[in-house]
Amino acid sequence: MAQEKMELDLELPAGASPAEGGGPGGGGLRRSNSAPLIHGLSDSSPVFQAEAPSARRNSTTFPSRHGLLLPASPVRMHSSRLHQIKQEEGMDLINRETVHEREVQTAMQISHSWEESFSLSDNDVEKSASPKRIDFIPVSPAPSPTRGIGKQCFSPSLQSFVSSNGLPPSPIPSPTTRFTTRRSQSPINCIRPSVLGPLKRKCEMETDYQPKRFFQGITNMLSSDVAQLSDPGVCVSSDTLDGNSSSAGSSCNSPAKVSTTTDSPVSPAQAASPFIPVDELSSK
């Protein structure tokens, strides 16, 4: 009944527009105005006809579209978020690996530099600890006037011969050096041996096999010659000395000549006296 009344109310105003101008046909309009929705719909009839179904369709379809789109949006955001997190984690891993590699390289370089420094320090210690026998000896720039240059001394601690530059004299005598320098030396040891020593020994060795008489004659001749040479008052020429030396050598070498000289008559006064005149020497 309500729908029929609505249809009748919609048809009547369009067909009975002149009746509205006349007064008697206005009862139907009043009846239609009694319904609360008809008047509002009649005033907004074009809006109701055009927008009401679309509004209803939108109201009915909008929750469905919203319901379909709502579950899709969190999934897309979640997947993108996961992808972003994975990318960040991958970048973090790459950065961590690069940082770790750099740390390892720096640690290796530091260890290598430490090893080189330790090796250099060990070499320095070995060089300084190597035994040096003469480095610790203080060498004076001015040589000592009492000690000889280049003199060697035996060191009992080093078991070797070292130079005596700045070292005290060793208590053990050196087997290589025969003579040692002394400050106070006796003048007797400095006297040179006699030149007639070898000749005297030779004559003594040869006279061991000769008779006693021959030995006495030779000694008398030698003693007289030495006394004559040592006497500063007698001047003897070089010719006579050469003749005496030759006669003495011939007398020592040949026993016959010696016997002739010893058998010659000599006065006891001349034999006892240590001096022989120059004339007799020249005659001989």
Curated annotation (Swiss-Prot):
The family note in this entry says: Belongs to the FAM122 family.
List where Low complexity composition bias occurs. Answer: 175-185, 243-254
Gene behind this chain?
Pabir1
Q: Does the keyword Cytoplasm apply?
A: yes
Instruction: Outline the subunit composition.
Output: Interacts with PPP2CA and PPP2R1A. Interacts (via its N-terminus) with PPP2R2A; the interaction is direct and this interaction inhibits PP2A activity. The CHEK1-mediated Ser-34 phosphorylated form interacts with 14-3-3 proteins.
Membrane-spanning parts: none
Recorded source organism is Mus musculus
Q: Where is the composition biased (Polar residues)?
A: 256-267
The lineage's top-level taxon is: Eukaryota
Record carries keyword Cell inner membrane: no
List compositional bias (Gly residues) regions by residue number.
20-29
Keywords of the record, alphabetical order, are: Cytoplasm, Isopeptide bond, Nucleus, Phosphoprotein, Protein phosphatase inhibitor, Ubl conjugation
Q: Cellular component terms, GO, for this chain's entry? A: cytoplasm; nuclear body; nucleus
Region listing for Disordered, in residue ranges? 1-65, 164-185, 233-284
- Function of the protein: Acts as an inhibitor of serine/threonine-protein phosphatase 2A (PP2A) activity. Inhibits PP2A activity by blocking the substrate binding site on PPP2R2A and the active site of PPP2CA. Potentiates ubiquitin-mediated proteasomal degradation of serine/threonine-protein phosphatase 2A catalytic subunit alpha (PPP2CA). Inhibits PP2A-mediated dephosphorylation of WEE1, promoting ubiquitin-mediated proteolysis of WEE1, thereby releasing G2/M checkpoint.
Places the protein is found: Nucleus; Cytoplasm
PTM comment: the record says: CHEK1-mediated phosphorylation at Ser-34 negatively regulates its ability to inhibit serine/threonine-protein phosphatase 2A (PP2A) activity. Phosphorylation leads to its release from the PP2A complex and its sequestration by 14-3-3 proteins in the cytoplasm resulting in its inability to translocate to the nucleus, where it otherwise inhibits PP2A.
Lineage start: Eukaryota, Metazoa, Chordata, Craniata, Vertebrata
Query: Residues where Phosphothreonine occurs?
Result: T146
Please give the name of this protein. Answer: P2R1A-PPP2R2A-interacting phosphatase regulator 1
**Annotated Gene Ontology MF terms?**
protein phosphatase 2A binding; protein serine/threonine phosphatase inhibitor activity
